[in-house]
Amino acid sequence: MTAIYAPVAVPSTNLPPPPPGQVAHPAIPLSIEQQWRNTESSRNERALDRINKNRARLGMKPIRDVLAYVLADHTWLAADASLAPMPATPAREVLQTGTWVLADDRPLPAGVKAFLERGEPPIFVGFGSMPVSADVSHVLVAAARTTGRRLIISRGWAELELADRGSDCIVVGDISHDLLFPRVAAVVHHGGVGTTATAARAGVPQIITPMFGDQFYWSSRITELGVGTTTAHATLTRDSLTRALSEVLDSAIVERARNFAGRVGVDGAKVAARELVAVARASSGGSGSH
């Protein structure tokens, strides 16, 4: 079986593939089907020979297509149907289980709790594992101050630090988003599936600054749903982030984000676990036991 985290991981007539992988010249419009064919061809050119050489060393037969090999007989989409509905895919059946959530109930650090309690809900910014420039902290602090908001920056893998040490901004390390997000005014992030889903469950507006892959899908979804907006990370400036913050802090978007949280809630991990047991029992030819 194969687990995917966004509908754009599977070829579809409804959704184009995420970048990189669209190899056509931008001046030539292509159908979604042709974009997927180009993507699959590019993937095979990059990886097929290397995979088959390794398989040959192990005495295994060669494969003909990377994606067909990766997508097993059972393909599960670990994403909420309200946030990321799976479109019809004529090539294969996909079971949408809902998001696989491991609750993070670690208490917030005392310093973070004290910061939250000192004023209005702040803006949270985190780019996870993305290799962002250290200079982005200047942009973040300036935009937050322009909108009159306090700021929490997550260090992330880029080890971000504050541009200055004003009392209106703090930096945090690894922290429970489950407990923090319901207490912030908005979440600015790169568009990772986990951060997107957690912010949606928390009912807070989002600003996604996508950099590659399925992050562009998630940025388009939160915009379509009216629970946030997007701004290109490559051209992120104080002005562009200020505009985005002003947009998502509008009462209409705040209300939509709050209401949308009630639509996100299926425990996809439990659904997947039940399906896994059913598949295992069917494969063994018996009903099995608890």
Q: Could you describe each region identified by the protein language model?
A:
Residues 1-33, 82-83:
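Conserved nucleotide-sugar donor-interacting segment of glycosyltransferase catalytic cores
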Residues 3-5, 191, 208-212, 230-235:
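Short beta->alpha connector loops at strand-helix junctions that form conserved
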Residues 47-99:
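Long, low-complexity segments enriched in small/aliphatic residues
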Residues 79-186:
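Donor-nucleotide binding loops and adjacent catalytic segments primarily
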Residues 172-221:
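A donor-sugar binding/catalytic signature common to diverse glycosyltransferases
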Residues 239-290:
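C-terminal amphipathic helix plus adjacent low-complexity
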